[in-house]
Amino acid sequence: MRLGRTARGEDLGAGRFCNSLSIRRGEQWAVVERLSLEQEQLHHPHGMGGEPVLGTLIWIAPEPLASEQLTELLEGGRADREGLSGTMAIGALEPGLIARYRGGSSQAARLWFFRLWRRIRAVQGLSEPSWPRTWPFQEADLALNPEPATAATTTAR
């Protein structure tokens, strides 16, 4: 999510962003969180740190993963941050994982989350995911190659 149109110099300003998420499996809570961002939190290092983009990917596994699988998934997710701007963190949930992005690039956030989704599907023995059609087409090149798309790669399509 991008807070404001930064290319136009816009940010949340005097506004307030509130979000609440609760995920339950049976009688057990897997995730419960609330987020409220106002002007002060936009610039605080424990808030947005002056960055306009935030995102969260939560995966609740259908069955508990073997510790080796979870370790491989988390280490791979950390390696997938290579070459991307922003602050990215990934950790284990019982069972599953949570990944968060905070930075200046919605493209970097989408790419990292797509890389993670590809790893999650591989762990489950599922096919390679398709690149979402609503995302800019040049990002499909980035999903397979961490190098930035160039004019040559986007016009060759």
Predicted regions: what is each one?
Residues 3-157:
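A structural signal for small-residue-enriched, beta-sheet-centric alpha/beta enzyme cores
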